[in-house]
């Protein structure tokens, strides 16, 4: 009797690394000459980051700094979903950045369809905000991982619980 192997596909990020990236971004913003007087603030909520700054120019610079610091901390830039820019009081601009965590049902269906179309001996099932993939051969599972890494999904994918 051959046992089956499996792994889970999830979309997650390390919150502590995000906190560190935001902290480093705030330090750089306070030290940079072009952003020193912009009175910029980055506020981390449960699943959002609020950027409050003086102008569109400084908002673009904050985007660059935040993305650079996140990339250096090994965070995928796909976790950031930049919302629309709103005007705030006192000629300031504000932007909400949603943090993407978990795989939506729509994207989970795309992943399972891709797996079922290309790998006949592999089973996949949606379990909440994760996708469980199982097969008899570990080589097939590794082929699935390589195929999913090659595909460009709108969220970062991690492979966990490899058994």
UniProtKB/Swiss-Prot annotation:
Species annotation: Trichodesmium erythraeum (strain IMS101)
The keyword Nucleotide-binding is assigned to this record: yes
A Pfam family it matches: DUF520
Tree of life domain: Bacteria
PANTHER family: UPF0234 PROTEIN YAJQ
Entry keywords, A to Z: Nucleotide-binding
Gene Ontology cellular component annotations, sorted alphabetically: cytosol
Presence of keyword Nucleotide-binding: yes
A Gene Ontology molecular function term of the record: nucleotide binding
Name the record gives this protein: Nucleotide-binding protein Tery_2743
């Amino acid at each position: 009797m051959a046992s089956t192997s499996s792994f889970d596909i999830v979309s997650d990020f390390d919150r502590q690394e995000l906190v560190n990236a935001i902290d480093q971004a705030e330090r750089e913003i306070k030290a940079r000459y072009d952003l020193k007087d912009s009175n910029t603030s980055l506020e981390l909520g449960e699943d959002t980051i609020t950027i409050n700054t003086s102008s569109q120019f400084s908002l673009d610079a904050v985007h660059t700094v935040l993305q650079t610091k996140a990339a250096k901390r090994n965070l995928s830039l796909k976790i950031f979903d930049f919302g629309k820019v709103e005007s705030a009081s006192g000629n300031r601009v504000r932007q909400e950045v949603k943090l993407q965590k978990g795989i939506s049902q729509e994207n989970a269906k795309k992943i399972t369809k891709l797996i079922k179309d290309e790998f006949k001996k592999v089973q996949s099932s949606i379990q909440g905000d994760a996708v469980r993939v199982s097969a008899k051969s570990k080589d097939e599972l590794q082929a699935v991982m390589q195929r999913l890494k090659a595909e460009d999904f709108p969220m970062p994918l991690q492979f966990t619980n490899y058994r």
